[in-house]
């Protein structure tokens, strides 16, 4: 592959984390909102919390925003009789795929009383529409402010790649030496790995498991793990997928590799799986089981053969680089 083909025409995925900037933006803009109705007035005083993910990304020459936030702010008001009130407004979901009328707001008056109701009503009628307007324009503000940062020229991207600089999220590796332990482990001696490759040394291993809930049908979630376009979206890197038994896969620019072992449509995926930092030739075996319920799907993950000391690293990677982005990109549930 020639140097100029690493990122032809901004074809691959680059991304910028804008969480800190977003918090600062709302801290600045929300307190500008105020309203009055006769002698009754109210205004936003501060932002209490702004939690979630905000990314500006570029894929196939298209710059997009992906965000999912929970925002809580405080307000203060006063009635014509001099009654003062403070309270909070919570938007549980400010997401890239919601519009002006889709946002939900919970209004809470501290030490509520009948005398304070006019302030709450003013907030509902005059303050909330202004917040909706601000939120509905957030995506465009993100693009205008940060779009140029992810739209790299071919020369810029190639220069970064040549220097080994990251242009997207990559899996965390645990490169520290580990102390062997046989407690609750299986020992894999030198010989063949689960994919048929050579294991160069004895590896003490453990098993890990976790369940995840998605607001999506099993067939959609199953496809999200196998369809190249979907995998590229949530992994933020071009995948290599040979989706068939014994077909190889490579994710996150080779940080995760393995082979498909079992593919039961909409029900189960079994793979060999390894991080590039693991002992040469050693593969774990990961099973994803898709359990469909009435309105959601439970994804059951079991990984056998994780090198001792890597358990937390692997669990964190599955959460941060599989589960969280799938929910965020496709709207398959709340991000915790």
Curated annotation (Swiss-Prot):
SUPFAM superfamilies: Activator of Hsp90 ATPase, Aha1 (SSF103111), Bet v1-like (SSF55961). Residues 169-187 have a biased composition (Low complexity). This is Uncharacterized protein C1711.08. Pfam families: Aha1_N, AHSA1. GO terms for cellular component: cytosol. It comes from Schizosaccharomyces pombe (strain 972 / ATCC 24843). Residues 162-195 are annotated as: Disordered. Coiled coil: none annotated. GO terms for biological process: protein folding. InterPro entries: Aha1 (IPR036338), AHSA1-like_N (IPR015310), ASHA1/2-like_C (IPR013538), START-like_dom_sf (IPR023393). Belongs to the AHA1 family. GO terms for molecular function: ATPase activator activity; protein-folding chaperone binding.
């Amino acid at each position: 592959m020639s140097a100029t083909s690493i990122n032809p025409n901004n074809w691959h995925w680059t991304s910028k984390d804008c969480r800190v900037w977003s918090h600062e933006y709302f801290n600045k803009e929300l307190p500008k909102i105020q309203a009055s109705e006769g002698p009754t007035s109210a205004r936003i005083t501060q932002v209490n919390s702004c939690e979630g993910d905000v990314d500006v990304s570029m894929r196939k020459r298209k710059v997009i925003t992906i965000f999912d936030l929970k925002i809580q702010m405080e307000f203060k008001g006063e009635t014509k009789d001099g009654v003062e009130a403070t309270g909070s407004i919570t938007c549980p979901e400010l997401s890239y795929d919601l519009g002006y009328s889709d946002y939900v707001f919970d209004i809470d008056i501290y030490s509520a009383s009948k005398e304070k109701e006019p302030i709450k009503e003013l907030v509902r009628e005059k303050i909330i529409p202004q917040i909706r307007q601000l939120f509905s324009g957030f995506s465009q503000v993100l693009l205008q402010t940060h779009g140029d940062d992810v739209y790299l020229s071919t020369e810029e991207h190639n220069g970064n790649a040549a220097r080994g600089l990251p242009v997207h999220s990559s899996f965390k590796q645990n490169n520290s030496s580990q102390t062997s332990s046989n407690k609750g482990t299986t020992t894999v001696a030198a010989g063949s790995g689960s994919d048929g490759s050579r294991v160069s040394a004895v590896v003490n291993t453990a098993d890990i498991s976790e369940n995840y809930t998605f607001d999506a049908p099993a067939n959609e979630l199953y496809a999200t793990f196998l369809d190249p376009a979907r995998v590229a979206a949530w992994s933020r890197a071009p995948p290599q997928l040979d989706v068939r038994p014994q077909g190889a896969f490579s994710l996150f620019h080779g940080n995760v590799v393995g082979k498909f072992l079992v593919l039961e449509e909409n029900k189960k995926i079994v793979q060999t799986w390894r991080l590039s930092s693991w002992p040469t030739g050693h593969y774990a075996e990961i099973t994803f089981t898709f359990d469909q319920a009435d309105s959601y799907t439970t994804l059951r993950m079991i990984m056998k053969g994780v090198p001792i000391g890597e358990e937390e690293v692997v669990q964190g990677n599955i959460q941060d680089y599989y589960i969280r982005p799938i929910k965020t990109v496709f709207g398959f549930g709340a991000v915790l």
